[in-house]
Regions:
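Cap/insert and terminal regions of metallo-dependent hydrolase folds
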Residues: 8-12, 28-38, 42-46, 142, ...
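Metallo-beta-lactamase
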Residues: 10-144, 180-247, 268-275, 326-346, 350
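Catalytic core of the metallo-beta-lactamase
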Residues: 102-110, 206-267, 284-291
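Active-site metal-binding loops of divalent metal-dependent hydrolases
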Residues: 118-120, 156, 217-219, 249-251, ...
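Acidic/histidine-rich helix-loop elements
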Residues: 120-137, 220-227, 278-287, 314
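Active-site metal-binding motif and surrounding structural segment of the metallo-beta-lactamase
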Residues: 129-179, 194, 265-271
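A short acidic, amphipathic alpha-helical/loop segment
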Residues: 164-169, 190-191, 256-260
Length: 351
């Protein structure tokens, strides 16, 4: 009997270990990002990228958060509320921003159409049947997009790098894609081509005098459990004849805001994240909160800012309307600078 019981325990342990090893092997093969190979820099140690300032919480902190979550309210929005079809092109010195959802915006400037972190999928997850799902439809129908010339992908998290959407854009529009180091190989693995990868402060040149510079952000990267920080993360500055536009991607607070503002002054418009910031003890290193977004507006010297990264996916403990409420309080406390909250699908010409 003792030997039989021992055999059962050993068999169960072997099955558990085998299952864990199997899951690890599957996630490495199908989900993990390929490793970047390049020279050591102040933000790459030869194996993994890092922030110039402290980066992200430990796995233990993540488990603590998961065990003690206090989620804010996220009501359902079952009926899509699509905005009007954007104009085909915008020129004559105009700058038009359309907020589509989450960090997906359409930037139209100098007859060039640019998408940031495009996401039209129902879930932002390695699989289609589980993981964070959207609480409202994208504000613009995919088929209503104008011709897309350029796509900016800030990092490899699923709510920013949606390979299904990128494949659809490639098929329909054939845009150039600009992304930080290491992400081009990951995209090619998923059948997405025409991606140019750059390091912080490097610049890609496009039609109509448009340049795109990869700029620092304080964040991290991961597609699976085993590939933390193999690929770089970033923001972007679009430099056009009609002015500079800054898209922050995902970022915590850091000195990079002032540095970007100094290098690209004056910045005509900034797109700054305001959501997924609670609880602060956990999110603070990688996500600014609404008050810090207002601070970033001033540090960058922005003429106008637009809020992004809210109202679509419940990724932090903040509720759907908490970011807007907290942003309005911070704006009122700082003299109400020009910082816009657009409705999903709303487009607006900026000064």
């Amino acid at each position: 009997m003792f030997e039989y019981a021992l055999m059962r325990k050993t068999t169960k342990a072997a099955i558990a270990i085998g299952s864990a090893l199997g899951v690890a092997a599957i996630e490495r093969i199908f989900f993990a990002a390929p490793r970047w190979r390049g020279a050591v820099t102040d933000h790459f140690d030869g194996e993994r990228f890092r922030n110039r300032e402290d980066g992200w919480q430990s796995e233990g902190s993540f488990l603590k958060w998961m065990a003690n979550r206090e989620r804010g309210a996220w009501p359902e929005h079952p009926e899509p509320a699509y905005g009007p079809r954007p104009p085909e092109r915008v020129g004559d010195g105009r700058l038009r921003i359309t907020f589509i959802n989450h960090s997906t915006t359409l930037i139209q400037i100098d007859d060039v159409n640019i998408l940031t972190d495009p996401v039209w999928s129902e879930r932002v997850s390695p699989v289609s049947f589980a993981g964070p799902r959207r609480h409202r439809a994208p504000g613009i129908r995919f088929e209503d997009l104008p011709p897309i010339d350029l796509v900016l992908v800030s990092h490899n998290h699923y709510d920013h790098m949606d390979v299904a959407t990128l494949r659809a854009l490639q098929k329909r529009h054939r845009p150039a894609i600009v992304t930080p180091l290491g992400n081009a190989a990951l995209l090619r693995r998923h059948g997405v081509h025409d991606a140019f990868e750059l390091d912080w402060w490097e610049t890609a040149h496009h039609a109509n005098g448009i340049n795109t510079t990869i700029v620092p952000a304080r964040h991290f990267s991961a597609r699976a459990m085993s590939d933390r920080n193999r690929n770089l993360w970033s923001g972007f500055v679009i430099s056009a004849p009609s002015g500079h536009v800054y898209f922050a991607g995902d970022t915590g607070w850091g000195n990079h805001f002032a540095e970007i503002g100094k290098r690209f002054s004056p910045i005509r418009a900034t797109l700054l994240p305001i959501g997924s910031y609670m609880p602060r003890w956990f999110m603070q290193p990688a996500h600014i909160d609404p008050a810090q977004a207002v601070d970033a507006h001033f540090a960058l010297g922005a003429q106008t800012s637009v809020a992004v990264h809210f109202g679509t996916f419940a990724l932090g403990d903040d509720g759907e309307y908490d970011p807007i409420h907290d942003l309005n309080e911070a704006l009122a406390a700082n003299g109400n600078p020009p910082f816009l909250v657009l409705g999903q699908g709303e487009g607006r010409d900026l000064p």
